[in-house]
Swiss-Prot record:
CDD domains according to UniProt: S1_EF-P_repeat_1, S1_EF-P_repeat_2
Listed InterPro entries: Elong-fact-P_C, NA-bd_OB-fold, Rib_uL2_dom2, Transl_elong_fac_P/YeiP, Transl_elong_KOW-like, Transl_elong_P/YeiP_cen, Transl_elong_P/YeiP_CS, Transl_elongation_fac_P
Species the sequence originates in: Pseudothermotoga lettingae (strain ATCC BAA-301 / DSM 14385 / NBRC 107922 / TMO)
One term of GO molecular function: translation elongation factor activity
Protein name as it appears in the record: Elongation factor P
Compartments reported by the entry: Cytoplasm
Family: Belongs to the elongation factor P family.
NCBIfam families per UniProt: efp, PRK00529.1
Length: 185
């Protein structure tokens, strides 16, 4: 059992005996009394999305998930192909199953496939992946005075902010949990 205040985007919980993936979660505090945890849940079975509100302090059952080491092979547009490393069996996930994880998938990336009752429902990425910068503005002398960074497009299409010294063609490390620049690779 997990407290609803600890729910995070991507977790899979059981609601009314059916597994649901947490698509969005927000906490709202009332002036007097307990807070409300508003969630957007997507049914793993049917794909329907519904809004569910929980009282602060409520507990929900976490789905019984299993994990297998796998490798990302390729994408054919709408589907993403993976291979289990232990028996070389291949699995296909849709873009909808992957959600934001699709922005970090490069060929041969090793990750964990997430299974619910022997059916793949998603992936668990490594905390940091190395991606190539394919487009960013050139740096100019004096850029660092204002601090901050500049926008960049990575090889997967992901758009993030990077420090001014990062140039097109360089490889950088990106945190898959936050989507932020970590360091040069």
């Amino acid at each position: 059992m997990v407290e609803v205040g600890d729910l995070k985007k991507g977790m899979v919980i059981m609601v009314n005996g059916e597994p649901h993936r947490v698509v969005d979660v927000s906490k709202h505090h009332m002036a007097m009394g307990r807070g409300i945890i508003r969630t957007k849940l997507k049914s793993v079975v049917t794909g329907f999305v519904k809004d569910v509100n929980f009282s602060s302090g409520e507990r929900v059952e976490e789905a019984n998930l299993s994990f297998r080491q796998a490798q990302f092979l390729y994408s054919d547009g709408a589907h993403y192909h993976f291979m289990a490393l232990d028996d070389y069996e291949q699995y296909i996930l849709s873009e909808e199953d992957l959600q934001d994880a699709k922005w970090y998938l490069i060929e041969n990336l090793e990750l964990s496939l997430v299974f619910l009752e022997d059916k793949p429902i998603g992936v668990q990425l490594p905390n940091v992946v190395t991606l190539k910068v394919v487009e960013t503005e050139p740096s100019f002398k004096g850029d660092t005075v204002s601090g901050g960074g500049k926008p960049a497009v990575l090889e997967t299409g992901l758009k993030i902010n990077v420090p001014f010294f990062v140039e097109t063609g360089e490889f950088i490390k990106v945190d898959t949990r936050t989507g932020e620049y970590v360091e040069r690779a």
